[in-house]
Regions:
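Single conserved hydrophobic/aromatic residue that forms the stacking wall/gate
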Residues: 1-8, 12
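Active-site-adjacent alpha-helix immediately C-terminal to a catalytic or transition-state-stabilizing loop
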Residues: 21-22, 32-35, 95-154
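Short glycine-rich phosphate-binding loop at a beta-alpha junction
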Residues: 10-16, 109-113
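Catalytic metal-binding/acid-base residues of hydrolase active sites
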Residues: 18, 44, 117
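Phosphate-handling substructures
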Residues: 27-94, 138, 148
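Small-residue (primarily alanine) positions within well-ordered alpha-helices
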Residues: 7-8, 20-24
């Protein structure tokens, strides 16, 4: 998909976590762009799950209850104990995007490799999605999302 789109990357921005790093490296290798400038920043890291960290969904449900875990996972502004809500993630990801990506977007193609909630936060910003809609949005793992920037707005390709 990316190769066919001719979306060659001039800059590669990634989070600090290994899985997204490896995904980005695979993409660059497949596109014959392994020498692309790489910038790592924890602002793109996955949502922090606090006390849920290290638990799978079943373990979290057993400890905190199915309804509570569902609220934490699918609410926009309710965070698990010691963790971040999707709003918190949005409030971390979007300023990074505005400061470090938007200034380059009109002259460069930028690859961003990150986890689902960081990407959902970014999609909310790019597509101006409501809080109610964004909590329903699923980001498929390993499936590229391509946006074209033109005339001050982003269009999903």
């Amino acid at each position: 998909t990316l190769r066919r789109s001719s979306a060659a990357s001039d800059v590669y921005k990634r989070q600090d976590l290994i899985r997204a790093q490896l995904t980005g490296e695979i993409i660059l290798k497949e596109m014959d762009q392994v020498k692309t400038e790489t910038i790592k920043d924890k602002s793109l890291n996955e949502r922090a799950y606090g006390d849920l960290t290290g638990m799978n969904k079943d373990e979290a449900r057993a400890k905190f209850g199915n309804d509570q875990v569902h609220i934490w996972r699918r609410s926009y502004d309710i965070s698990p104990p010691g963790g971040e809500s999707l709003k918190d993630t949005h409030d971390r990801v979007v300023p990074f995007f505005k400061e470090h990506i938007e200034p380059e977007i009109s002259s460069k193609n930028i690859l961003i490799a990150a986890h689902g909630n960081s990407l959902r936060a970014l999609v909310k910003h790019l597509e101006d999605i409501s809080e109610q809609e964004i909590v329903q949005l699923e980001i498929a793992t390993g499936v590229p999302i391509i946006y074209k920037f033109s005339d001050g707005s982003y269009a999903k390709q």
